[in-house]
Amino acid sequence: MEQDKLEYKPDYASAVSTAMRRPLTDLFSHIRSLAAHEELLTPYLRQELEGVLLSGYRLLRVADSISAAEKYEPAENAMTVFPLWPHLREGLEAARLLLGVSGSTLQYDLPETQETVRADEEMLMRAVLHLISNALDAAEDGTLVTVRGSIVGEQAVITVSDTGCGIAPDRLDSVFEPYTSLNRDGLPYQSLGLGLPLARRVLETHGGSLRIVSTGEGTAAVCSLPLCNELPALLRSPAPPYLQDTFSPLYTVLCEYITPPWPYSQP
């Protein structure tokens, strides 16, 4: 059922995403123009402009989610062989820094080894960020979110867990339902509800899996990904500039829990 709901017409999804991005480009351009004259902004106007900026990032997250829904079958040219743990460590450290500034706590414990996987780097990182975002959505203020990595047989296992109130047993079966997004009180949340189903699809199309475990005292999203025996390319593209690219998945997926970057401070 979940798979059928995700398989909507790509042309329609592309048109919706493109239609959203055009006015968003204008919106961010106008925000940048106003921010460039910061000396003219009163504290009140600065606060209001920050609110508009956050709304822009929320809409960009929606557009990105719709685009990502099209890409749940990774393109062959996007698949590369790379060391998994260094790749995750770089993205998680960037997320930890941004979340820490905003008062949320993320910690991670990853192996220091160099096991490789064959995957779409951007989509894999996006999937992990969605799991972190979902953990923060369901967590109480000050709840710790932890990402752990391990090797089990021929699989890399990534576990994203929180110490919140957990998920009610009668809701566990519906957490992967697309377009169903509920907060910890069971009330509708302001998102499309595509994070978990897309994260699972990303893992499954890479030969892995995603399952949710909740005992009433916290929740864990357990990802598995097959290891690859190939060596990474000697000449690989540079690692994504997670912090420098202020429109990367790091900023859009986690926009509810970080302070959006003030546009005038961008290089």
Question: Which role fits each region the language model picked out?
Answer:
Residues 72-78, 116-119:
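Conserved micro-motifs of the catalytic ATP-binding
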Residues 162:
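Acidic ATP/Mg2+-coordinating residue in the GHKL
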Residues 217-219, 224-267:
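Flexible, glycine-/charge-rich segments associated with ATP-binding catalytic modules
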Residues 100, 105-115:
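Conserved catalytic submotifs in the C-terminal HATPase_c
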Residues 167-179:
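Short conserved segment of the HATPase_c
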Residues 51-59:
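Short alpha-helical segment of the dimerization/phosphotransfer core of two-component systems
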Residues 207-208:
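Conserved glycine-rich
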